[in-house]
Amino acid sequence: MKIKQILTNRNLSNGKDYGIVNEWEDVFSQLLDVPLYYDDWKRRDKTLFWKFPWLASFYQTSIPTFAYVMLPIASPHGNNKKNIIPCMIDFYCREKDELQQFYKRYDKCPLVLISSKEAYDFLVSIKCPLNIKHLPLSISDKYRINDKTIFNKKYDVVMLGRQNAVLQAFLNKYSEQHHDVTYVYGKKEGHGFRYFDQSGQDLGCMSTREDYMNLMRLSRIGLYATPAMDGGRTDTNGFNQVTPRFLEYLVNGCHVIARYPKNSDTHFYELDKMTTRIETYKQFEEAMDRLRCKDVDVSYYSQYLEKHYTSNRVQILSNYLEQI
């Protein structure tokens, strides 16, 4: 099978979560030398398709298409067709009824890609009837670094988006005991965050993908946790996928202090080699003291990231397609 286009909904969606998806789509489009296909929801009666999801397929393209799907059973997107290869970004289905919905939603697709190794292994273990393969998440090649890359740091820690409660509490305690620490934190504002430094200076909303990455690039240390760690997100049904923020920290030259369970996804991304894993405040304090005054090993980072740029995922997909 040969992909002829990449499905995108960038004309309808916004926000940094979809911004990174659009970056992946751009790399797939460029390297496969195929156009982007803009999903046209303007002519669709969403209420009707929510009631009868199978109808959406009649309005979807008939050309061989690759599509990223944010949530596999959340909306009637019409991707259940023999010409569409969907890749599930977030897969949280565990209950029997959810799994049956998932199977039914994609039973016509010749191949269904699962981004989480943990979720993929789970589906294999329960004998998922679909033809599934693992296609990991990535970081766009536009951010590629090499051993000559120089990072100019301004803050010890920059906290972007939702935070792990334990890491947040540890940093609060650390800042009370170490008054020289510099950090950036966010306050919820509308659907996003407004950011401030440790002195209370307003840094703005970082509303674009570029703003987000540029601010992260100023941080020496990133605090990272998988989504369900410490009771963080309950909607993941216990799945603890490694999210792209981990790769964003690395490509922006940040040390990573992390909390995560050991599973096949954290093993795939080698978090044990690429982060300082902590359990207690004492471990956190020791890691902060050490990493605040230490540069990252850019050569080590660049070698690791070569395995996780989006171009690598394009090659994996191409290999899968040769088997169809």
Model-flagged regions — what are they?
Residues 76-190, 309-312:
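Catalytic core of nucleotide-activated saccharide and alditol-phosphate transferases
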Residues 146-158, 194-202, 288-297:
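Short, surface-exposed amphipathic charged segments that create phosphate/polyanion-binding patches used
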Residues 1-126, 259-263, 314, 323-324:
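N-terminal pre-catalytic "stem/leader" segment of glycosyltransferase-like enzymes
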Residues 194, 199-218:
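Conserved active-site histidine-acidic residue motif and adjacent donor-binding/catalytic loop
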Residues 22-28, 32, 209-213, 217-321:
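Catalytic binding pocket for nucleotide-activated donors in carbohydrate/polymer assembly enzymes
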Residues 41-49, 191-201, 224-233:
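Flexible internal linker/loop segments at domain or repeat junctions
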Residues 42-46, 94, 140-144, 188-194, ...:
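A short acidic, often aromatic-flanked loop/helix-cap motif at beta-alpha or helix-coil junctions
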Residues 141, 202-206, 237-238:
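Short gly/ser/thr-rich secondary-structure transition/capping motifs
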